[in-house]
UniProtKB/Swiss-Prot annotation:
One Pfam family it belongs to: Iso_dh
GO MF term (any one): 3-isopropylmalate dehydrogenase activity
Site (Important for catalysis) location in chain: Y141, K192
Name of protein: 3-isopropylmalate dehydrogenase
Classification via InterPro entries: IsoCit/isopropylmalate_DH_CS, IsoPropMal-DH-like_dom, Isopropylmalate_DH
Residues that hold substrate according to the record: R96, R106, R134, D224
Residues annotated to bind NAD(+): 76-89, 282-294
Assigned protein family: Belongs to the isocitrate and isopropylmalate dehydrogenases family. LeuB type 1 subfamily.
Length: 360
């Protein structure tokens, strides 16, 4: 029986970059005889326009039945004025929570060909390879109660809640330790245990889980210091594990150490490694339709999908090698362009990766 992959291009540049990723996926499917079948649907603003909601029930059901989901990006100014509960981003939060995608893996890798693209000195970032493991379905983004109320005198007050259960922390900690075990055997847990009760529990549980991983070196760091250390000396980190909000912020910061968020993929996994894969960048509505968006993060998300959800490491490595070969050829989209290289658009970059993959 064939494996089912649901394609959700989303909004903004999503359809453009997804078209290139699908070309690469289809070639890998044929080249490595993977037996995938692809289905397409809508999410985010595109779903609001079609169904009136950011994630239709039938789309969610298709995602549940699929073996993996490949997503582009959601959101845009067109939908900024509608009710908060039905904005495009709510579709993304809903599909993550409903599919139980609690573990978000966000690599920050500096390709040697792009060393000049980083805003930091080459000696600080050269060879950078960090993996941030972010808890994705708990914490302040999902906590209740939340809302607004009116205080005496008519002043408005807004409030959110940051809850974490022991089981939520334990399962994401295990993912962090498992990833560290097959990499550099170093795990840094990031929290704010000097202030937050949820972080105090987080640290206690991570320490307990560490007993099962004596071969992994565990350290703890407050989130404010971690944000500073990522800029000061990022290569001290191998795998970082942290909560939903801290991970959201730190992974975006880490991505810019590499020179372009347009290069970075991500994976969101459930307990069985079934997952949703998407680029780290957003929908970039300011360049949508111009044909200049960088498709490499989405193409590399295909590679992550093959590795983590389908255990197809040979196909994953081939895609990564194809991307590296294209960079060796000096092809660059505008976001990673530097003197001496050739600037190309979205489609030409995708075609180049396809050609490189075909010739491997």
């Amino acid at each position: 029986m064939s494996k089912q992959i649901l394609i959700l291009p989303g909004d903004g540049i999503g359809p453009e970059i997804m078209a290139e990723a699908v070309k690469v996926l289809e070639l890998a499917n044929d080249k490595f005889q993977l037996g995938f079948s692809l289905a397409h649907d809508v999410i985010g603003g595109a779903a609001i326009d079609k169904h009136g909601v950011p994630l239709a029930d039938e789309t969610l059901e298709r995602a549940r039945k699929a073996d993996a989901v490949l997503l582009g990006a959601v959101g845009g100014p067109k939908w900024d004025k509608i009710e908060r509960d039905i904005r495009p981003e709510r579709g993304l939060l809903k599909i993550r929570s409903q599919l139980g995608l609690f573990a978000n893996l966000r690599p920050a890798i500096l390709y040697p060909q792009l060393a000049d693209a980083s805003s930091l000195k080459p000696e600080i970032v050269s060879g950078l390879d960090i993996l941030i493991v972010r808890e994705l379905t708990g914490g302040i983004y999902f906590g209740a109660p939340r809302g607004q109320r009116e205080l005496e005198g008519g002043e408005r007050q807004a409030y959110d809640t940051l809850p974490y259960s022991e089981s939520e922390v334990r399962r994401i900690a295990r993912v962090g330790f498992d990833m560290a075990r097959v990499r550099g055997k170093k795990l840094c847990s990031v929290d704010k245990a000097n202030v937050l009760a949820s972080s105090q529990l987080w640290r206690e549980v991570v320490e307990d889980v560490a007993k099962d991983y004596p071969d992994v070196e565990l350290s703890h760091m407050y989130v404010d210091n971690a944000a500073m250390q990522l800029v000061r000396a990022p290569k001290q980190f191998d795998v970082m594990v942290t909560d939903n909000m801290f991970g959201d912020i730190l992974s975006d910061e880490a991505s810019m150490l590499t020179g372009s968020i347009g290069m970075l993929p991500s994976a969101s996994l459930d307990a069985d490694n079934k997952g949703m894969y998407e680029p780290c960048h957003g929908s970039a509505p300011d360049i949508a339709g111009l044909g200049i968006a960088n498709p490499l993060a989405t193409i590399l998300s295909v590679s992550m999908m093959l590795r983590y959800s389908f255990n197809q490491s040979a196909a994953a490595e081939a895609i990564e090698k194809a991307v590296s070969l294209v960079l060796d050829q000096g092809l660059r989209t505008g976001d990673i362009f530097s003197e001496g290289c050739r600037k190309v658009g979205t489609q030409e970059m995708g075609d180049a990766v396809v050609a490189a993959l075909r010739n491997l």
